A protein has these predicted regions:
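Active-site PLP attachment segment
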Residues: 1-11
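Generic non-transmembrane alpha-helical segments
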Residues: 32-40, 73, 77-79, 129-138
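Conserved C-terminal alpha-helix-loop-beta "cap" of PLP-dependent enzymes
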Residues: 58-113
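Anionic-ligand binding region
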Residues: 34-37, 42-73
Length: 155
């Protein structure tokens, strides 16, 4: 399949030409997203190393939040996300990777995985962060565990 081989070679060359710029943009957007979420959403944890990670991937855990509810409400706002690892997409079980790095089951269950691309814009990140803040606040307002936590910490 000579045409296929030639086409694959050309596609590889094009990808290599754009890889450095694409990676740089994705890292900048990823780091911006991480900073905003950690600064603006209380009781949130970044899962995995802050630097040694894929340039286009973030995974957060939100205490007192059920992952499935989070996904449904974000989906209603037009945000496509996952609650587990890519290996468990479509499953309601928490990510086995998050459990393996020591997250308790209830925190791993409230995880959110977002994937960016070089086509993602800063405005889309801003929209996503605002949506996350709104949804997390709404879900926590319905959580008896969060209510108990707040009461105990006010004393």
């Amino acid at each position: 399949n000579t045409p296929g081989i030639v086409g694959f070679g050309r596609a590889t060359a094009l990808a290599k030409e754009k890889m450095e710029a694409r990676t740089k943009k994705e890292v900048e957007l990823r780091d911006y997203l991480i900073k905003r979420v950690l600064d603006e959403v209380p009781y949130t944890k970044l899962n995995g190393d802050k630097v040694k990670r894929l340039p286009n991937n973030v995974n957060f855990s939100f205490r007192f939040i059920e992952g499935e509810s989070l996904l449904i409400m974000l989906d209603q706002k037009g945000i496509c996300a996952s609650s587990g690892s890519a290996c468990t997409s479509g499953s309601l079980d928490p990510s086995h990777v998050l459990l393996a790095i020591g997250l308790p089951h209830e925190i791993a269950h409230g995880s959110l995985r977002l994937t960016l691309s070089d086509e993602t814009t800063k405005e889309e990140i801003d929209y996503t962060v605002e949506a996350i803040k709104t949804v997390v606040e709404r879900l926590r307002s319905m959580s008896p565990l969060y209510e108990d936590f707040v009461k105990k910490n006010k004393q």
